[in-house]
């Protein structure tokens, strides 16, 4: 059966896939050792997951994302960064891919998303600072919140 187009050209089939990939991002986020915010990222290209990532510390460091004062350590790698770095270390490319996130990107990650060639970002929760979404808009990366 043909896909029924909803507003913005999104089809029911696309929405179904979007929800499924966000559920995968939830599972990935649960692997994070961070206490304050567990974030998951899934990169999908041609209907296949090519990478996933969650926020955490660098390889070889203790899995402690927060300082004693409760703030996130500077050396924590964001979920988007982990997923994008996995693609960079593989034979895959992010060109035209969709990134699924449990939390919208910060400005730092939005820059990487743009430069990696991600075409679309789907996220569930909004980060406290929306500068990252603003950059995506200015650079032509479509993004949408799916609750």
Give the location of each predicted region.
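Zinc-dependent deaminase catalytic domain
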Residues: 1-147
């Amino acid at each position: 059966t043909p896909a029924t187009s909803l507003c913005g050209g999104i089809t029911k089939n696309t929405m179904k896939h979007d929800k499924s990939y966000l559920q995968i991002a939830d599972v990935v986020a649960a692997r994070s050792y961070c206490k304050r915010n567990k974030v998951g990222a899934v990169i999908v290209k041609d209907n296949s997951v090519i990478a996933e990532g969650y926020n955490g510390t660098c390889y070889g460091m203790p899995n402690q994302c927060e300082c004693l004062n409760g703030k996130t350590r500077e050396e924590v790698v964001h979920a988007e960064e982990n997923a994008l770095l996995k693609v960079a270390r593989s034979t895959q490319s992010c060109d035209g891919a969709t990134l699924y996130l449990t939390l919208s990107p910060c400005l730092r990650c939005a820059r990487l998303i743009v430069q990696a060639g991600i075409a679309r970002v789907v996220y569930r929760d909004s980060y406290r600072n929306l500068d990252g979404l603003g950059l995506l808009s200015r650079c032509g990366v479509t993004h949408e919140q799916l609750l």
